[in-house]
């Protein structure tokens, strides 16, 4: 029985020694006082720099081609009422130019005089389609222009190109006979702005 008693006593002693976790002292939370942000200093006013002027001025294509057309019309080698194929103006400058506007201005100036009968843009489009050329094809070479002129039964072809520096280009025109390819008139002049 002593054994039972010693075991019971040991059990009581051991149950009384339950370990508790140590209590850590709690510190009060640190209070952070709000800080007002510093007011940013406004930078001194900046002088606005004006944008540079645009270098690209509009081109007066009609004024550029009228003197050349006047010279061509006064040529003795061309009969009144001749059929003319107007090829689109080519850009051979070192930049971009609105050559479609140049072609349109040239068409208007030529339409206003009675020396030539112009092949209509519709006839030209049909002929290009028949020959397998796209409508945007500017014919690019004199030989293509002459071949197309023969196809539409034109007597003459006006081949024009703009060359030189894009800031001060020169327009050149050549009037050629469609049957022989002979240049019967040639002229050039500055492009006017």
UniProtKB/Swiss-Prot annotation:
One of its GO terms (molecular function) is enzyme regulator activity. This is Penicillin-binding protein activator LpoB. Residues 35-54 have a biased composition (Pro residues). InterPro entries: LpoB, Membr_lipoprot_lipid_attach_CS. It comes from Yersinia enterocolitica serotype O:8 / biotype 1B (strain NCTC 13174 / 8081). Residues 1-16 form the signal peptide. Regulator of peptidoglycan synthesis that is essential for the function of penicillin-binding protein 1B (PBP1b). Belongs to the LpoB family. GO terms for biological process: peptidoglycan biosynthetic process; regulation of cell shape. Keywords: Cell outer membrane, Cell shape, Lipoprotein, Membrane, Palmitate, Peptidoglycan synthesis, Signal. GO terms for cellular component: periplasmic side of cell outer membrane. It is a lipid-anchor. It is found in: Cell outer membrane. A lipid is attached at residue 17 (S-diacylglycerol cysteine). A lipid is attached at residue 17 (N-palmitoyl cysteine). Interacts with PBP1b. Residues 24-55 are annotated as: Disordered. Pfam families: LPAM_1, LpoB. It comes from the Bacteria.
């Amino acid at each position: 029985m002593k054994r039972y008693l010693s075991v019971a006593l040991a059990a009581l002693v051991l149950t009384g020694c339950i370990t508790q976790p140590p209590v850590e002292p709690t510190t009060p939370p640190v209070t952070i006082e709000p800080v007002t942000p510093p007011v940013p200093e406004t930078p001194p006013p900046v002088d606005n720099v004006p944008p540079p002027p645009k270098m690209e001025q509009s081109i007066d294509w009609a004024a550029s081609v009228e003197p050349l057309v006047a010279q061509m019309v006064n040529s003795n080698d061309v009969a009144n009422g001749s059929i003319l194929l107007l090829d689109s103006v080519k850009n051979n400058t070192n930049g971009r130019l609105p050559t479609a506007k140049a072609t349109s201005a040239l068409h208007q100036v030529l339409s206003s005089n009675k020396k030539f009968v112009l092949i209509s843009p519709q006839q030209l489009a049909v002929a290009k389609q028949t020959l397998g050329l796209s409508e945007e094809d500017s014919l690019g070479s004199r030989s293509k222009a002459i071949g197309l002129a023969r196809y539409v039964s034109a007597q003459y072809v006006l081949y024009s190109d703009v060359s030189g520096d894009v800031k001060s280009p020169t327009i050149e025109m050549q009037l050629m006979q469609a049957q022989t390819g002979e240049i019967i008139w040639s002229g050039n002049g500055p492009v006017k702005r």
